[in-house]
Swiss-Prot record:
Annotated SUPFAM superfamilies: Ribosomal protein L13
UniProt family annotation: Belongs to the universal ribosomal protein uL13 family.
Gene3D superfamilies: Ribosomal protein L13
Gene behind the chain: rplM
Keyword annotations of the record: Ribonucleoprotein, Ribosomal protein
Task of the protein: This protein is one of the early assembly proteins of the 50S ribosomal subunit, although it is not seen to bind rRNA by itself. It is important during the early stages of 50S assembly.
Protein name according to UniProt: Large ribosomal subunit protein uL13
Description of how the protein assembles with itself and partners: Part of the 50S ribosomal subunit.
Top-rank taxon, per record: Bacteria
Length: 151
């Protein structure tokens, strides 16, 4: 019987990619980033293994949502205490912690288990254009989420 060859963790080549989120649609960007984190863009993808790459997202404060979502999309968190629910809109969270918006969108698209938590640690999000990962020599990954756009 011939078995399917599974890649060994030490033979997998994990690259670093940098993605510019400026003027990109939030959900479409998060979907593409989640695919790269999961490793679905590789031939050796295996569902139960970490075959993905590291992703650095810069310009998180410039990500956009369409329609009335800037005022209507709500982000909720709870302190665990009675009456401890905090609610803020997309605009409020973007002013306060712009990195959190992309992190929450991508985290929701990863598996809800130990593998998903490990994959999430490979996502690095920064508000400006600078990031401290130059030593890893990240490649530029172009993701175009603008319909009909030329980016």
């Amino acid at each position: 019987m011939i078995k399917t060859p599974l890649p060994k963790q030490e033979t997998l080549d994990q690259k670093w990619y940098v993605v510019d989120a400026a003027d990109q649609r939030l959900g479409r960007l998060a979907s593409e980033v989640a695919k790269v984190l999961r490793g679905k863009n590789k031939a050796e993808y295996t569902p139960h293994m970490d075959t993905g790459d590291f992703v650095i997202v810069v310009n998180a404060e410039k990500v956009v949502v369409t329609g009335r979502k800037p005022e209507q999309k709500l982000y909720r968190r709870h302190s665990g205490r009675p009456g401890g629910m905090k609610v803020e809109t997309f605009n409020q969270l973007q002013d306060r912690i712009p990195e959190r918006i992309i992190e929450k969108a991508v985290k929701g698209m990863l598996p809800k288990n130990a593998l998903g938590r490990r994959l999430f640690t490979k996502l690095k999000v920064y508000a400006g254009t600078e990031h401290p990962h130059a030593a890893q020599q990240p490649e530029v990954l172009t993701i175009n989420t603008i319909p009909g756009g030329d980016n």
